[in-house]
């Protein structure tokens, strides 16, 4: 029997929002979410029954990018809806240049992006019911009352703009979400936009709150979500100079982007795809030279970042790994997601054994109730320190206040006052607290 995450919160091991790109219609995409990306892609391509009815006319599909690390399934669905409908999302609204109300400084005022503001990405097209029955009686009356649906562009590069805007906007920028790329083309588009705005993710878009230096974490696996693609490889006799100055031949370079089609089109009614208020532009072509994607950049593309676990802890989690659900994955990218969850359980098993000896908060000195696992947390770097969750949050907020004049309710990172190691994103601390609570219930 499944338990609702609303009644009893649980952090999903793997739940991703994905962007599909049609290979038969290069300018058509589909946004969705799933706990099993491999099976979901097979459903979209008609290889597995059930679901994926909307995408049946544009097969085959390929999965270009995934966003993962959501605190709950409901959070992923919120992100998916905003990615699908940026023109209607309240999180993607036009704000003042400094992110504040008029006549107020950024240190004292925060702005909520309500529906009264203009959308960052206005609707670019509209759809209405078919007029095939134009000769039916009473059609004129029905045409007056029919509803016109506003839609957002489905161009792949446009969806990348929306993704970057969501990752910079509240509350998504504080969830420490990860981005994974499964194609060289998708990684090249991301790099193209990243070079144009290298400080895009230094602060949040609305409250101007500093974000972690490595946000958002990016990883690549060019073998595809199913592990069946062959990554592009440079010539065997390529020199270091050749790798820096030459460009790979992308399969997507043979397709026309929306900008190229606009130049060739003579119709004045064709709506441009770059009519948006987001301060980034779409590349005008899909070849590697336009994207600035060299062989050297492909060789140094980031892979999945593994979680650091102290030596000897993996053996302690063998039983926990046996109880965990394994994804039917053939790629290191998805395997790493589940392996990180197993490593996290190993860390929590090791830390839970110290509960008897460490029952004093390292900050306030008060007693820690071990029977309420959601009230305390261990050091994120596996030292012996234990803290009340509220005490660690208060201490971390004090560290942030030194660099930022404003005070917030929750920190973006957690500092351990004992070991003085680099900070860890606060969502990771919360995720470990809930995972430890689940582990104690199952033990």
From Swiss-Prot:
Record-given protein name: Structure-specific endonuclease subunit SLX1
Disulfide linkage: none
Main localisation: nucleus
Requisite cofactors: a divalent metal cation
UniProt cross-references to PROSITE patterns, sorted A to Z: GIY_YIG
Family: Belongs to the SLX1 family.
Top-level division of the source organism's lineage: Eukaryota
Keyword terms, alphabetized: DNA damage, DNA recombination, DNA repair, Endonuclease, Hydrolase, Metal-binding, Nuclease, Nucleus, Zinc, Zinc-finger
Mapped zinc finger ranges (SLX1-type): 361-419
Location of region: Disordered: 121-140
Ranges of residues in domain GIY-YIG: 13-93
SUPFAM superfamilies: GIY-YIG endonuclease (SSF82771)
Role played: Catalytic subunit of the SLX1-SLX4 structure-specific endonuclease that resolves DNA secondary structures generated during DNA repair and recombination. Has endonuclease activity towards branched DNA substrates, introducing single-strand cuts in duplex DNA close to junctions with ss-DNA.
Molecular function terms from GO: 5'-flap endonuclease activity; crossover junction DNA endonuclease activity; zinc ion binding
Enzyme class: hydrolase
Pfam families to which the protein is assigned, alphabetical: GIY-YIG (PF01541), SLX1_C (PF21202)
GO biological process, one term: double-strand break repair via homologous recombination
Gene Ontology CC terms: Slx1-Slx4 complex
Assembly and binders: Forms a heterodimer with SLX4.
Subcellular location as annotated: Nucleus
Known EC number: 3.1.-.-
Originating organism: Malassezia globosa (strain ATCC MYA-4612 / CBS 7966)
């Amino acid at each position: 029997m499944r338990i609702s995450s609303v009644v009893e919160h649980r952090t999903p091991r793997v739940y991703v929002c994905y962007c599909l790109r049609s290979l038969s219609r290069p300018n058509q995409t589909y946004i969705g979410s799933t706990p099993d990306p491999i099976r979901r892609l097979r459903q979209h391509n008609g290889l597995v029954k059930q679901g994926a009815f909307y995408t049946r006319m544009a097969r085959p599909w390929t999965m270009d990018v995934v966003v993962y690390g959501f605190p709950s399934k409901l959070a992923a669905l919120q992100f998916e809806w905003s990615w699908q409908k940026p023109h209607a999302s309240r999180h993607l609204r036009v704000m003042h240049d400094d992110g504040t109300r008029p006549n107020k400084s950024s240190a004292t005022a925060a702005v909520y992006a309500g529906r009264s503001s203009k959308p960052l990405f206005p609707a670019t097209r509209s759809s209405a019911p078919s007029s095939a029955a134009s000769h039916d009686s009473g059609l004129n009356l029905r045409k007056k009352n029919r509803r016109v649906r506003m839609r957002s562009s489905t161009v792949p590069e446009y969806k990348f703009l929306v993704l970057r805007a969501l990752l910079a906007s509240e509350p998504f920028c504080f969830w420490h979400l990860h981005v994974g790329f499964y194609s060289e083309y998708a990684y090249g588009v991301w790099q193209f936009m990243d070079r144009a705005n290298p400080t895009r993710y230094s602060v949040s878009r609305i409250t101007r709150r500093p974000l972690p230096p490595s946000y958002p974490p990016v990883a690549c696996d060019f073998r595809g979500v199913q592990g069946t693609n062959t990554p592009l490889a440079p010539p065997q006799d390529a020199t270091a100079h050749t790798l820096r100055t030459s460009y790979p031949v992308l399969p997507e370079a043979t397709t026309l982007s929306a900008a190229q089609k606009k130049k060739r089109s003579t119709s004045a009614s064709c709506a441009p795809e770059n009519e948006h208020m987001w301060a980034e532009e779409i590349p005008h072509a899909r070849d590697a030279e336009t994207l600035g994607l060299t062989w050297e950049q492909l060789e140094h593309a980031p892979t999945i970042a593994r979680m650091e676990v102290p030596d000897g802890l993996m053996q302690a989690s063998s039983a926990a790994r046996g109880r965990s659900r394994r994804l039917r994955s053939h790629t290191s990218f998805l395997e790493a997601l589940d392996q990180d969850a197993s490593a996290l359980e190993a860390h929590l098993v090791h830390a839970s054994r110290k509960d008897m000896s460490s029952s004093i908060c390292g900050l306030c000195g008060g007693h820690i109730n071990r029977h309420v696992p959601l009230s305390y947390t261990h050091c994120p770097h596996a030292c012996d320190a234990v803290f009340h969750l509220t005490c660690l949050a208060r201490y971390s907020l004090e560290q942030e206040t030194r660099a930022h004049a404003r005070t917030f309710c929750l920190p973006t990172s957690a500092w351990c006052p004992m070991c003085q190691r680099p900070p860890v994103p606060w969502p990771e601390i919360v995720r470990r607290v809930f995972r430890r609570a689940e582990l104690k219930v199952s033990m």
